[in-house]
Amino acid sequence: MAQEIDLSALKELEREAILQVLYRDQAVQNTEEERTRKLKTHLQHLRWKGAKNTDWEHKEKCCARCQQVLGFLLHRGAVCRGCSHRVCAQCRVFLRGTHAWKCTVCFEDRNVKIKTGEWFYEERAKKFPTGGKHETVGGQLLQSYQKLSKISVVPPTPPPVSESQCSRSPGRLQEFGQFRGFNKSVENLFLSLATHVKKLSKSQNDMTSEKHLLATGPRQCVGQTERRSQSDTAVNVTTRKVSAPDILKPLNQEDPKCSTNPILKQQNLPSSPAPSTIFSGGFRHGSLISIDSTCTEMGNFDNANVTGEIEFAIHYCFKTHSLEICIKACKNLAYGEEKKKKCNPYVKTYLLPDRSSQGKRKTGVQRNTVDPTFQETLKYQVAPAQLVTRQLQVSVWHLGTLARRVFLGEVIIPLATWDFEDSTTQSFRWHPLRAKAEKYEDSVPQSNGELTVRAKLVLPSRPRKLQEAQEGTDQPSLHGQLCLVVLGAKNLPVRPDGTLNSFVKGCLTLPDQQKLRLKSPVLRKQACPQWKHSFVFSGVTPAQLRQSSLELTVWDQALFGMNDRLLGGTRLGSKGDTAVGGDACSLSKLQWQKVLSSPNLWTDMTLVLH
């Protein structure tokens, strides 16, 4: 047990100076806890993906991570030594410098322990079982300060006024007495506020901990108990921040999310400034790219009565190919939690049809307000040719307890009809929020880029005498080869850094539902890859190909065993691509028929990815 630190010998101003440092230390700890929470959330998503196995018939024959069906003789998979689950070859991650491997979940769990430092506390608990919970010096000082003070919140005392200064004039003495009375009333106000907030926090944490006990095992309940004990300290620190603005002023200047000077400057600007002043230094540039929106995109969120409007502006720089969405404010939003009259809004954007985590941008969360002010600029790197195929989705969400999301409304803007060169379209506008549509109507054919390929049906030639002898008789079709050369792709949805680790998958589906799959090598860090890779499908006849379909998909290889991102795909065959309109479907049929009708000749095609 650590020894308690005695602060009774310090003066009031010295305590406040120490308290300022403790608040900064607490802010650093909160940032570290947020980083740890994101790592554990990503690990939990991987575990949930492996748990979503509804195919009970093939329960013992599927990979425990990606649910891919395993074979009896080939591709049987292997058992992970960490979790004792059978996984396929694609769900294994080899450790650096060794031949040992782990599954994606065990490897991610190992990385989380390394990055968060949990391995150190586990080893310490083995050597010192009665060591207790880790406690920093800053936490000990905060506890000593709380026990020393009679009230939970102590505002900073003003500079001392000498009696000689007060005795010079009776007005000074009267003013000094009123100032002391005002300080006393402020102390009483923050005392009642801190006590009330602390009671609400304890009751809310007790309710969430009871729900968590029913849903999780005993191992996770221990972590929830520790988190609940930390929440009381967080509430006390938050109330102190409100009560001592002078102390926390240097801390707010260090944190860009808490800075208010740019906002005050921007409010003095006219309502419709010129485009050159809209995207100036008055806004925080950049955005947050997180990994915890998988549940919301799958429909796992709550809905509120959509009300209110959002104000933003759109600007595109043709030199840097940068699309900037400047989110200014919202008004008259609905409450995310109607019973508690609570709303913690934030804004999230996508460039449809890309809904991946790399294509998401979002602002910071504004607490307890239905009229938030964001003043943030979200950026995308998009080529001008891709703007006509994109739609900007701007949605507003409420962040509740336990990371629960509530949908508050959205705005869909087709960029094909947006005039980026007109100065009036670059000024701020209010857009009414609408409910989430079940299916977005595409005003323009959406495209994820273009894929250039060459195809040829290779058939063996017959001798002339045998061909003349078999004319007019029913003869079996010759087995040939379908050769496909994947040349390259362009206008693909790239990552935030402007690169891709792309590869192509080809799948030929025969009439008997047999599937022939091939894959190209990965080209790393190229926005416009040029593979020039050949796919050869052997043992097929022209009669089979007339009733078959060829599906080509372009993927972006993920890192650290995560799921690869689908960039787009297209389909050639008798049925065409059913995911697009009638014109594109008929075009794919004509291209497929042209390949089959001209054997032993190359046919160049440019396919649009959807």
Swiss-Prot record:
PROSITE patterns: C2, RABBD. Residues 306-428, 462-603 form the C2 domain. GO terms for cellular component: exocytic vesicle; plasma membrane. The keyword Translocase does not apply. CDD domains: C2A_SLP-3, C2B_SLP_1-2-3-4, FYVE_Slp3. It is found in: Endomembrane system. This is Synaptotagmin-like protein 3. The lineage of its organism: Eukaryota, Metazoa, Chordata, Craniata, Vertebrata.
